[in-house]
Regions:
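Short catalytic helix/loop segments, enriched in acidic residues and glycine
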Residues: 2-21
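Glycine-rich, phosphate-binding/catalytic loops in enzymes
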Residues: 3-4, 70-73, 99
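Aromatic/hydrophobic pocket-lining residues that form π-stacking "cages" and hydrophobic walls in ligand
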Residues: 16, 41-42, 67
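Residue-level signal for alpha-helix termini/capping positions
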Residues: 21, 43-47, 72, 124
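Short beta->alpha junction loops
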Residues: 26-36
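Short, glycine-/small-residue-rich phosphate/pyrophosphate-handling segment
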Residues: 28-29, 76, 89-126
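Short, electropositive alpha-helical surface patch
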Residues: 37-56
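Mid-chain, well-packed structural core segment of small domains
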Residues: 50-89
Length: 126
């Protein structure tokens, strides 16, 4: 947990819901460790024009052409924020190769779970 902190996923979702409510935002959560499920979800939301997508693609950042293609298509109509809890640029060399960054308006890395809250603040300020 050293790289990722101590907050469990259920608690994180509650905290994000509270933050979104305070900002008068609607948010939808989706999590999967299965590449195809992530791609299917991204493809299913392409109709939500002018929406924001906050994504922590984890290791798929460095490996998934399918996720890259889905985000490329999505980025034509929506804005994407990439969040990584740990600083992927200061970790292993293979993590320095980022397949999705070019489709993201901003990348927030190494800020712990606070990166998700920074993403909501960024959206709110736009």
């Amino acid at each position: 947990m050293e790289k990722y902190g101590e907050t469990d996923y259920t608690t994180l979702l509650k905290l994000l819901d509270n933050k979104a409510k305070a900002l008068d935002m609607e948010i939808e959560h989706f999590q999967s460790n299965v590449e195809g499920e992530l791609v299917n979800f991204i493809q299913s939301i392409h109709h939500a024009l002018d929406s924001w997508v906050v994504i922590n693609p984890g290791a798929f950042t460095h490996t998934s052409i399918a996720l890259r293609d889905a985000l490329n298509t999505l980025s034509a109509q929506n804005k994407i924020i990439e969040v990584h809890i740990s600083n992927i640029e200061e970790r292993e060399n293979f993590r320095k190769f980022n397949l999705i960054k070019e489709f993201c308006e901003i990348s927030i890395i190494g800020e712990g779970i606070d990166g998700y809250f920074q993403a909501l603040d960024y959206i709110n300020d736009k």
